[in-house]
Swiss-Prot record:
It comes from the Bacteria. It is an enzyme of class 5 (isomerase). Keywords: Glycolysis, Isomerase, Manganese, Metal-binding. Mn(2+) 1 binds at D399, H403, H459. Mn(2+) 2 binds at D11, S61, D440, H441. Its EC number is 5.4.2.12. Catalyzes the interconversion of 2-phosphoglycerate and 3-phosphoglycerate. Belongs to the BPG-independent phosphoglycerate mutase family. This is 2,3-bisphosphoglycerate-independent phosphoglycerate mutase. Monomer. It comes from Francisella tularensis subsp. tularensis (strain SCHU S4 / Schu 4).
């Protein structure tokens, strides 16, 4: 029987001494409290420069899992795109130039779609504004912005400022206008809720929506009047001078999100010839360009293609003939597979994967336990089987329930996770294995913004825990660690040499 090394990633579980609406600190967590007292622990960085993001930028699930799995600081798309804009090479990008040239050659429209937000998690509005300026410089006559609204990585009702900026820029350049708005709940689903994606797609492509208004600001105001915050704005079309905008053959569409997981579904609706998740009027003959690669199967141009890192944790385990398991529920499954493997879709030899479906509820505060019971059942069975040298799992609760802004539900989620951790601890210790518990970023550690006294639905920049649970004696060797130090630590406890590509350092020293 193999002695399993288990990495538990508690998504959105940040550390804060403050008890002000801190769902993690204020929840009843007897198992967590005892582990925190009994076993070696430290706090590590999961945001900003330490994970390859701009200074003070909060971390996120994609970035976190890439850094953990690669064992090095991986500079993120946000940083790369910011650099291209700063160095004035953004407008020279071949894919972007081809999309603009297509619209000019065909005297057709250029559509920009994406999350209009300063959040910096899935997109950044400054990238959209820069693209608008470049389009004007290169001779585009008609540009239409289809704005997805955030309210999740930003305050729930904060889109007005972004819409006003976009409106002013388009007006100043006499270039076009915001042609549709919708909450990211619809356009950026990642859990096969195609009914939501269909509403967003129809508003963008067919100008078919439940609501039509004269301006994006009016659409936002009316949405607030219906008590729908930014994230949940029902797809709405904007009518200017009696004209509704549709996406037509020979148009160019540039998707301005840089993060893949929530951009895939609607991209497939635009590009797949045999798409069958909902009816489309026709398969459009358009130039579809994405800022980064969302899915290798998508038929589209990519402005900033991925760089595939070598010797990630998964690859090193394979080369050392170790068996590994990745497990998560739907919401975080891409993170423990695709992102953890540095953007690689294919499984490594000896790598098994278990996907547990996320519950079909409108928002996860309605079911704070999500699919944690099923994830835990599978994990305990895998540990007991003695089949795996290394298991990587993700619990989505503290992030996904944290994003709802529901403090009571977030505490319930944390308390349920505490029960799950108790089961994992018992199984690991019984089989003389090793368990590491960490997080990819913070979230549920601040459920209300202390400055505004309003719900805080975004991630935090707080440090995250890193705990060792096992029978080995361990000492903290690195006081100021970061996510990229986790993989080297796992290799250390497993007795596997760290490859030179992994620049992280081991956080704990283990007695031989």
């Amino acid at each position: 029987m193999k002695k399993t090394t288990l990495l538990v990633i508690l998504d959105g579980w940040g550390y804060s001494d403050s008890d002000y609406f801190n769902a993690i600190k204020n929840a009843n967590t007897p198992t967590w409290d005892s582990i925190w007292q009994e076993f070696p622990k430290t706090l590590i960085n999961a945001s900003s420069l330490e994970v390859g993001l701009p200074r003070s930028q909060m971390g996120n699930s994609e970035v976190g899992h890439v850094n953990i799995g690669c064992g090095r600081v991986v500079y993120q798309e946000l940083t790369k795109i910011d650099k291209a804009i700063e160095e004035k090479t953004f407008g020279d990008n071949k894919a972007i130039c081809a999309a603009i040239d297509n619209a000019i050659k065909n005297d057709s429209n250029l559509h920009l779609i994406g999350l209009l937000s300063p959040g910096g998690v899935h997109s950044h509005e400054e990238h959209i504004f820069e693209m608008i300026k470049i389009a004007k410089q290169k001779g585009i006559k008609r540009l239409y912005l289809h704005a997805f609204l955030d309210g999740r990585d930003t305050p729930p009702r904060s889109a007005e400022k972004s819409i006003k900026k976009a409106d002013k820029l388009l007006q100043d350049l006499n270039l076009g206008y915001i042609a549709s708005v919708c909450g990211r709940y619809y356009a950026m689903d990642r859990d096969n809720r195609w009914d939501r994606v269909e509403k967003a797609y129809n508003a963008i492509v067919n100008a078919n929506a439940d609501f039509i208004y004269d301006s994006a600001l009016e659409a936002l105001e009316q949405s607030y009047a219906r008590d729908q915050s930014d994230e949940f704005v029902i797809p709405t079309c904007i009518k200017k001078d009696g004209h509704l905008v549709k996406v037509q053959d020979n148009d160019s569409v540039i998707f301005m999100n840089f993060r893949a997981d929530r951009a895939r579904e609607i991209s497939h609706a635009f590009t797949d010839e045999s798409f069958d998740h909902f009816p489309r009027k026709k398969h459009l003959n358009i130039n579809f360009t994405t800022l980064t690669e969302y899915d290798s199967k998508l038929k589209c141009a990519v402005a900033f293609p991925p760089e595939q890192p070598i010797n990630t944790l998964g690859e090193v385990l394979m080369k050392n003939h170790k068996t590994q398991l990745r497990i998560a529920e739907t919401e975080k499954y891409p993170h423990v597979t695709f992102f953890f493997n540095g953007g690689r879709e294919e499984q490594f030899e000896g790598e098994d994967r278990i996907l547990i479906p996320s519950p079909k509820v409108a928002t996860y505060d309605l079911q704070p336990e999500m699919s944690a019971p099923e994830v835990t059942d599978k994990l305990v069975a895998a540990i007991n089987s003695g089949k795996y040298d290394c298991i990587v799992c993700n619990y989505a609760n503290s992030d996904m329930v944290g994003h709802t802004g529901n403090y009571e539900a977030a505490m319930q989620a944390i308390e349920y996770l505490d029960k799950c951790i108790a089961r994992l601890k018992d199984a690991i210790l019984e089989h003389d294995g090793n368990m590491f518990i960490t997080a990819d970023h913070g979230n549920a550690d601040m459920m209300v913004n202390p400055e505004t006294q309003k719900p805080h639905t975004a991630h935090t920049t707080n440090l995250v825990p890193f705990i060792y649970v096992g029978h080995k004696k361990a000492q903290v060797a690195l006081e100021h660690g970061k996510l990229s130090d986790i993989a080297p630590t796992l290799l250390n406890v497993m007795g596997i040499a760290q490859p030179k590509e992994m620049t992280g350092k081991t956080i704990f020293n283990f007695e031989k």
